[in-house]
Amino acid sequence: MGEHPSPGPAVAACAEAERIEELEPEAEERLPAAPEDHWKVLFEKFDPGSTGYISTGKFRSLLESHSSKLDPHKKEVLLALADSHADGQICYQDFVNLMSNKRSNSFRQAILQGNRRLSSKALLEEKGLSLSQRLIRHVAYETLPREIDRKWYYDSYTCCPPPWFMITITLLEVALFLYNGVLLDQFVLQVTHPRYLKNSLVYHPQLRAQAWRYVTYIFMHAGVEQLGLNVALQLLVGVPLEMVHGATRIGLVYVAGVVAGSLAVSVADMTAPVVGSSGGVYALVSAHLANIVMNWSGMKCQFKLLRMAVALICMSMEFGRAVWLRFHPSAYPPCPHPSFVAHLGGVAVGITLGVVVLRNYEQRLQDQSLWWIFVTMYTIFVLFAVFWNIFAYTLLDLKLPPAP
């Protein structure tokens, strides 16, 4: 499971080193194997005194003289970085970070706070793009609020690996729903079938000791009405987010929402079962919508207000359906219908952990204080819920519905 769809730093560094060697004939001598050493040899040609800095003038001259051979977007970022240094010098580490596809907060700030803003035409103004290039550009504008990040993503995305996590989850959900529908001979409001809860994937309070049920419940849906909305949101929101942020980060937010959803039900709605992937879906969509609101002026996706309104209406309708079903007379008394609290657990994860992930494109999450705050809060909640499930049901002398 990769963190980001672009190649790793070492691979990107070696590829870029070969490109620079083509641009600069003087760098044709044999270089050491380590990626940073490639850059050190080139850097030292412009820093004969080994000061650790080169003048921005020399740096600009190198880029301008080979502008026809160097990727225009990467050249633009390099120039912005060079012009951001008021002392007229660029340090070796910034040079290595850019060439190696390594991003840091200080590196981002050097660009964003520079004297020269990125002034060439934006991605939206470029013509003659292929269908795949237009798709990548569309995804960049749908998910990233900064032009510098959009250009970086556009240049580095290779579709290797593809957004496999969300697609795999979606295919499994659809396949298991169809299988269960054929088995029960019911597709609409499938959850009302008397044998529905007998499936070993459903979370049931009487079987809460079977830990896998806290996750596998996402593969069982109340009916085609719940499945349809969740699948649509996973494909329309989850897949683009995974293309940008990678399967590891998006999978982390999704699974965290799923687990938080079932644990929230076990604490707040103790007698109810749980089905559906709404916990994970609501985590992703809530994080995406919150990121748009927090970066409203920077997000350039078309009709963003209308699309946000449509997304909120769809989420509200699904939540309303879940609330109605929860209090509808049960098809298998005394056990109630599935709970709606998992939706709220997903939202809580989305506006905390999810927002931190989406706001820090290609940044180390370990360096973000908010990340550790929310991870700590999430861990405390999980531990609390585990102890609650072990002790509270007995202490409260709660009468649970019998196992299906």
UniProtKB/Swiss-Prot annotation:
User: What reaction does this catalyse?
Assistant: Cleaves type-1 transmembrane domains using a catalytic dyad composed of serine and histidine that are contributed by different transmembrane domains
- Where is each EF-hand domain found? 34-69, 70-105
| GO cellular component terms listed in the entry, alphabetical order | membrane
Q: List the disulfide bonds.
A: none
Q: Pfam families, alphabetically? A: EF-hand_7, Rhomboid
InterPro entries, per this entry?
EF-hand-dom_pair (IPR011992), EF_hand_dom (IPR002048), Peptidase_S54_rhomboid_dom (IPR022764), Peptidase_S54_rhomboid_met (IPR017213), Rhomboid-like_sf (IPR035952), Rhomboid_IM_Serine_Proteases (IPR051739)
Classify the protein's membrane topology as the record does.
Answer: Multi-pass membrane protein
Look up keyword Secreted and say if it applies: no
Bilayer-crossing regions: 164-184, 227-247, 250-270, 274-294, 305-324, 338-358, 371-391
GO BP field: proteolysis
Documented EC number(s): 3.4.21.105
This protein's UniProt keywords? Hydrolase, Membrane, Protease, Repeat, Serine protease, Transmembrane, Transmembrane helix
Record's subcellular location: Membrane
Name the major location.
membrane
Which residues catalyse the reaction? S278, H343
List the molecular function annotations (GO) for this entry.
calcium ion binding; serine-type endopeptidase activity
Report whether Membrane shows up as a keyword of the record.
yes
The text of the family note is:
Belongs to the peptidase S54 family.
Instruction: State its role.
Output: May be involved in regulated intramembrane proteolysis and the subsequent release of functional polypeptides from their membrane anchors.
- Protein's recorded name: Rhomboid-related protein 3
Taxonomic lineage per UniProt? Eukaryota, Metazoa, Chordata, Craniata, Vertebrata
